[in-house]
Amino acid sequence: MKHFQSKVLTAAILAALSGSAMADNPPPSTDEIAKAALVNSYNNTQDINGFKVGDTIYDINGNGKITRKTATEDDVKADDFGGLGLKEVLAQHDQSLADLTGTVDENSEALVKTAEVVNDISADVKANTAAIGENKAAIAKKADQTALDAVSEKVTANETAIGKKANSADVYTKAEVYTKQESDNRFVKIGDRIGNLNTTANGLETRLADAEKSVADHGTRLASAEKSITEHGTRLNGLDRTVSDLRKETRQGLAEQAALSGLFQPYNVGRFNVTAAVGGYKSESAVAIGTGFRFTENFAAKAGVAVGTSSGSSAAYHVGVNYEW
């Protein structure tokens, strides 16, 4: 049995009033009603502020008997709020909402930074692509077949000239004849030029292979960055939905509280009243209905319930007593 159910008290008061109005049995005494109402007020205060093991609580059975007891760990666990109280629950709710908002902001900043990294990688890829184009153009220019053919023609011409110089029939003076050393030197220079061209071509091929490898590496990094952006986007969407749900629940609760605060309590002794009110907060609205009874000039009780007008909203209720002196 949970500590003092406010709904049970309300039902007991209304049943007692209805029974006294419809039957000959005498209604409960003012002291009994006042005692039950004061106990209810005490427990409602605990519902708002919370209670812990060792605090004093009250139980009421089906016959309306009220028993005072010391709260145990089972009583705290059986409480709707776990002994925290409505104030603490609302404070935790507000803190959770603030934490989620901060997380959304952090993920947004991380997403912006990731986008900057992707832009930098894209710029590097474009630069490498341009460098590959330049290398290909340089290779085409250095290894141009026309240049090689020109070298070959020069080699052929030199061989012909050497053969002509060495022809005894054409020799007039010793100064006009190439020596063996001169001929060997000319062949060595030509061979060096051909070797240099081959070295240049090989170097350009190596640079081209390195550039292609760099492009492949950048492609892998770009794919990884795109995957990271997708994951961050998914998380951000989930956080947006969570924040939206919390915002909706908070606005619904405030609208229901506004509606409950508009309910009236009875003014005339011995009069029973029914009251209704509407309330709203930003885009949410709620409707509340309530009832009350003034027992004496000094003592009155009332109860009310509110429901939001939008789909998926939960109900809120209150039970209160008033004692004047």
Swiss-Prot record:
Residues 24-137 are annotated as: Head domain. It comes from the Bacteria. Residues 86-135 form a coiled coil. GO terms for cellular component: cell outer membrane; cell surface. The keyword Coiled coil applies. Several alleles exist that vary in length, this is allele 5, which is not cross-reactive with all antibodies against alleles 1, 2, or 3. An antigenic bacterial cell surface protein that adheres to and induces bacterial uptake by human epithelial cells. Belongs to the autotransporter-2 (AT-2) (TC 1.B.40) family. This is Neisseria adhesin A. It comes from Neisseria meningitidis serogroup B.
